[in-house]
From Swiss-Prot:
Residues 357-418 have a biased composition (Acidic residues). The chain crosses the membrane at residues 244-264. Residues 154-170 have a biased composition (Polar residues). This is Protein rpi-1. Expressed in amphid and phasmid ciliated neurons. Keywords: Cell membrane, Cell projection, Cilium, Cytoplasm, Cytoskeleton, Membrane, Transmembrane, Transmembrane helix. Gene3D superfamilies: Doublecortin domain (3.10.20.230). InterPro entries: Doublecortin_dom (IPR003533), Doublecortin_dom_sf (IPR036572). It comes from Caenorhabditis elegans. Its main location: membrane. The keyword Transmembrane helix applies.
């Protein structure tokens, strides 16, 4: 009988059967039927795969194997099935073959070429064979950047033997710094007008800040004022008939000015007509009509210029000049009695101080048409008549000639209506100046020559 010392002691394997040490210890025993397999992840062609060693004495069912696979391979719903590369399901451990590839899946198998593509390992590119960082190119960059006197000969030339072995470090950064320094040495600082040299610019300094933006205050818009805003509203005209003036003279009322004429006209008429709005502004020298801005049809009035008579000059003269009577017309031949009556009437008219009261009366046959004739009544300027300047002699003569022409036209109209005239209705000239009498004397001389 063999002694206990000669008996071969068999060690019990207490290690993990799936570990590499367990495989090495059990590799010599053929009776155990140990198998080595590789399991890949379903749907991942670049998966490296996990190697498993299956001992049928330890692992007798598929459930512990799937638990080990689930711990090593991460799937969305866990490792629930094993497939062959052809897509067949492995139902038991006995179907597993040694050295084969299997795929762990959750539900459905995805056919791919598993195990042929290993996962790529990304590494930085080598500078040894790249065309940009080749040694020849670096040498040309160094020689071009330096001055001819400071150029170095390449190390691989025949004159100098290689001093060291191995891959040399790139000197591109140093080349740029030397290039800038050589440029600065080659171009010295130019002196100023005063003789001081400018300090060289520092390339490493901080970037200068931009100047702050100026705050611009918006200018107020200019409002264009129209010329009509500053003007006073035009004074309305009041229509005064010459018949009213005659009635006032017959009643013994002395008409003194334009305001008095307006008052008499207002008393005479109970319902005055509406005041016109578009009336030209009356100035001391001349009257300028306002243009029609609205574009509507409008009749522009050109009233006669107002005659301003200085009251002081009238009171200084002892006797007013006597105006000669008008010569008789062909339509209404005058008698000596009529001529004397007109002379008396002219004297009475010339003694009146204002030019407005010198307007003559008209026949009653004119009716309502005579009431429509207008006399300008400027109430604002009535009080300042004496302060205004007298018009020139030439303007007075032009005004008098225009008035005489208008009176002659009125006489012709009256003669057509009624041939018979009375001394009261006889027309007389409203001119008080000397120019009117001279024109009448010329007319008389022409008739006498004829």
């Amino acid at each position: 009988m063999p002694t206990p010392s000669t008996k071969k002691k068999v060690k019990k394997v207490a290690e993990d059967p799936l570990s590499s040490s367990g495989v090495s210890s059990l590799s010599g025993i053929s009776s155990y039927n140990i198998r080595k397999i590789s399991i890949y992840k379903n749907g991942d062609r670049y998966h490296r795969g996990v190697k498993f060693v299956i001992n049928p004495r330890v692992i007798k069912d598929m459930e512990p194997l799937l638990n080990q696979v689930n711990d090593r391979i991460e799937l969305s719903h866990g490792a629930k099935k094993l497939y062959t590369t052809d897509g067949k399901i492995v139902n038991s451990i006995k179907e597993l073959e040694d050295g084969k590839i299997y795929v762990a899946a959750s539900a459905q198998f995805i056919p791919m070429r598993y195990g042929e593509f290993a996962e790529k390992v990304w590494k930085p590119p080598s500078r040894k064979h790249s065309p940009i960082m080749s040694s020849d190119r670096i040498k040309t960059a160094r020689t071009r950047s330096q001055d001819p006197s400071k150029r170095r000969q390449p190390q691989n030339s025949g004159s100098s033997a290689p001093t060291g072995s191995g891959v040399q470090r790139s000197r591109s950064v140093r080349t740029l710094a030397e290039d800038r320094k050589s440029r600065r040495d080659a171009n010295p600082a130019r002196p100023n007008v005063n003789g001081a040299s400018n300090a060289p610019k520092k390339f490493d300094g901080a970037r200068p800040k931009a100047p702050p933006a100026r705050q611009t205050i918006p200018k107020p818009k200019k409002i264009l004022t129209t010329s009509t805003t500053n003007k006073k509203p035009p004074t309305p005209k009041r229509k005064v008939s010459k018949k009213v003036l005659g009635a006032a003279a017959a009643a013994g009322v002395t008409v003194v000015g334009a305001a008095a004429i307006g008052a008499v006209a207002a008393a005479k008429r109970s319902t005055p007509k509406p005041i016109p709005t578009a009336v030209s502004d009356v100035s001391t020298a001349s009257s300028i009509p306002i243009p029609n801005v609205t574009g509507a049809a409008e009749i522009l009035e050109f009233p006669e210029e107002e005659k301003k008579i200085d009251m002081a000059t009238i009171h200084r003269t002892p006797t007013p000049p006597v105006v000669a009577s008008r010569p008789a017309t062909a339509k209404a031949p005058g008698t000596p009695a009529n001529r004397s009556a007109t002379a008396l009437e002219a004297k009475s008219v010339s003694q009146q101080p204002t030019p407005e009261s010198s307007e003559e009366e008209e026949d009653e046959g004119n009716g309502d048409e005579d009431d429509d004739e207008e006399v300008e009544d400027d109430e604002e300027d009535a009080g300042s008549d004496e302060a205004e300047e007298e018009p020139s002699d030439e303007e007075e003569e032009d005004e008098e000639t225009e008035e005489e022409e208008e009176e002659e036209e009125e006489e012709e109209e009256d003669d057509d209506e009624s041939r018979v005239e009375t001394p009261a209705s006889r027309k007389s000239s409203s001119a008080v100046s000397f120019s009117g009498s001279t024109e009448e004397d010329h007319k008389k001389g022409d008739e006498a020559k004829k």
